[in-house]
């Protein structure tokens, strides 16, 4: 089974899984890498997060002892889209590009995971979902807790 354009094989797929488990027609999970960084104010590099996550994921064990299975098989596989090129895109342009990247997959029955960089990148994915699901509630998981009290 040949992968369609816009999708990655085992070399760049989440977990490094091979066909047929990384094929988008079969997979129940889509990973959509959209690296973006423009408003970071301290240490730069959040735009490298999606590629670092994909690279590190190849070291993850497939078998989950608590579940007693290889979850990606239970889900039909995990397909990873080719990374969205956001070079030269700033703020609204990047948000619009990410929204356009994610929108075609919303409502398809796939579980979508969008890997961005900084906080702004999530807005495009959220807008894509909110356009289809107006009552959407968002829980955003950040790299840190942001639990420091205001001074």
Which sequence ranges carry the predicted segments?
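Conserved alpha-helical scaffold segments that buttress catalytic/binding sites
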Residues: 2-151
